[in-house]
Amino acid sequence: MRTYSKVVINKKALRMAQTGHPWVYGEEVVRIDGPWQTGDLVDVYSEKNKYVGTGFINDVSKIRVRLVSRNANDTFDDAFWRRRVDYALAYRRTVMGEDDFSCCRLIFGDADEMPGLTVDLFSDVLVTQTLCYGMDRIKERIFKPLVEGLSTYGIHIRGIYERNDVKVRELDGLTQYKGWYEAPWLPERPGKPMTTICENHILYDVDIENGQKTGFFLDQKYNRLAVSRLAVGKHVLDCFTHTGAFALNAARGGAISVTAVDISEEAVERTISNIEKNDFSPTVKAVQANVFDLLTQLAEEKNRDYDFIILDPPAFTKSGHTLKNAYRGYKEINLKAMKILPRGGYLATCSCSHFMTDELFRRMLKEAADDAGVSLRQIEGRQQSPDHPILWNVRETDYLKFYLFQVV
């Protein structure tokens, strides 16, 4: 017999839930029957007493309930979570294939019905981030079957590193921290929080302790290959390079020269290390500079040294409140890149902000092209790699826009 407390939701929340969206906001709750604490599982019902689903409740977050199931018969025991993990692993093994499975995103939150949980596999290390209070409480039920499941594919994990050092955790009532996860079924001494991965036949040192997000951006894996195919014989400017991934893929594709730019000293140092690791010097050089200032300077000088520019900025907005400023920022860098490129040059441009929708991004690019007095010939329009699956009924899972253009 089920003993979960009952959350009754209004018609607006019911309509969203019926489309498959897993979130219930605080203002959409009509009443709660029975005792509960943040992080508990609760059953969600309509005002007509129809079962909607079961999820984690939170009295701190604006999202009051995050659904994890719509089956009233689920028991949420160890076997339930193991099935979820096995399904996630099997999906990645299928869509990524054996070669790309050793460094990919294994769990992508709501897209895998494990809200607020991110797990990235970097060779012999799992890097995790937990943003949902309820998932944080039961994470061992996820971590252990992940490690056991990976071993069946011949991947042996030496440690799990938690990157819970993000302020957004506080919105769910969680504290910030980072460090190795300790459990009796894991090695006692996992070693340094560094590892090496191979992506697209290129080696990278990954700083899982201090690198951005979980240490390496896996979502651009196949977009980098698209850049590599176009880079042969080109002089490439890679802006916001982070660890140099686009730059190194351009070099591997046959670029004559590549300049990788980032404002972060640590990012430039890591890029230099990756250049040396792959023997791409002197083809690739890393430069510490403010990309906005550099693009302004090159545009004013009418510099024609580059015939391929890559723009992969961090998210300029993480909320709808700052979208207008973000729009201007995206337009500024794209406009300047279009002014710098010669006719027939190539532009790869991205946005990783969910709030900057594809429609807005395309509108911004059209405005930038009009202002620059150029036309854009689209070569490819792409999204995140399939280990970051997009659920059409959960729009928040669709966030990465990537376009390749020829400027004509």
What does each model-found stretch correspond to?
Residues 266-310:
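S-adenosyl-L-methionine
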Residues 305, 332, 346-408:
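C-terminal catalytic and target-recognition region of SAM-dependent MTase-like enzymes
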Residues 107-120, 139-216:
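Non-catalytic substrate-recognition/targeting regions of SAM-dependent transferases
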Residues 306-336:
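Mobile active-site "lid"/loop adjacent to the S-adenosyl-L-methionine
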Residues 233-242:
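Conserved class I S-adenosyl-L-methionine
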Residues 257-262:
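Conserved SAM-binding motif I beta-strand of class I
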Residues 243-256:
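Conserved SAM-binding loop of SAM-dependent methyltransferases across substrates and taxa
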Residues 1-123:
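Non-catalytic accessory regions of SAM-dependent methyltransferases
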